[in-house]
Amino acid sequence: MKNMKNILLIMVSFIGLELAAQQDPQYSMYMFNGLAINPAYAGSAEGINANVLYRSQWPGIDGAPNTIVANVHRAFMDEKIGAGLSFNNDQIGVMDRNTISLAGAYHLKFKYSKLAFGLQANYSQYNIGLSRVQHSQDNSADPTFAANLSESTINFGAGVFYYADKFYAGLSVPAILNNDLSATEITGGQQALEVPQFLYNAGYIWAADPMIDIKPSILIRHTSGAPINFDLNVNAYYKKFIGLGVGYRSSNALVAMLECQVHPYVKLGYAYDRELTDLGVFARHTHEVLLRFTMGPKGAQISPRLY
């Protein structure tokens, strides 16, 4: 009976792996962190750009999802070549996934716009912390939970990004390969696949008057065998210094956003998600914080970027 209970606990922990392997983590402030969803974004902005994002989903619930994203990118060779480096940490329950991605992009310049083609390579490490499972009231030793399990995968992504001063649109697949983790030690025989996810995003910046800009944007997610999800957002900016935004996620969530250009090179962002489903008091809230740095050549002036 005790062994059966242990097996059930392990299988429950693997549910997080299956869900995480089938869909990449979502971000409310995707429009300010383009490299996280499209490798072709690398080198599309002025100077050296670095982003750090933290997302806490359903705080107050043990084992709730948490995501940390850090990336940096810049352009080279007269802005024809872009390169970027990303790190992602996703945690849910006793499972966590660490991913390092190296992206490269080639930018074609037109009269008033650019078109970029990007590729990326991903290395992911999955870890199951069985030693963190509370399997008995007295927390007595059990060899079933003595070891932690891990598995690694390699994947590749691709994307296209078209952008101008007032408009942008992109199509990407951050991970193309169907890596099957079902036969690995960490799944315990449960189905776990890295299924490709197609991402489509677009946005337009409308100058309502000399001091106010309005930016509608959309992100569409499509995974084979799953419903199509989308995020629809509208952000308003005053003097490109402070911005307020609202959004709707088709998977039943409302989003509120606040941004502030605290320094010519530093932007702060905060997003609050409110779940519309009946998941309980704590499971209805998600918080997201973004810190963005833009560093140009010494003495150069860089205009605040709205995407």
What are these regions, as identified by a protein language model?
Residues 4-16:
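Sec-dependent N-terminal signal peptides
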Residues 22-307:
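Subset of outer-membrane beta-barrel
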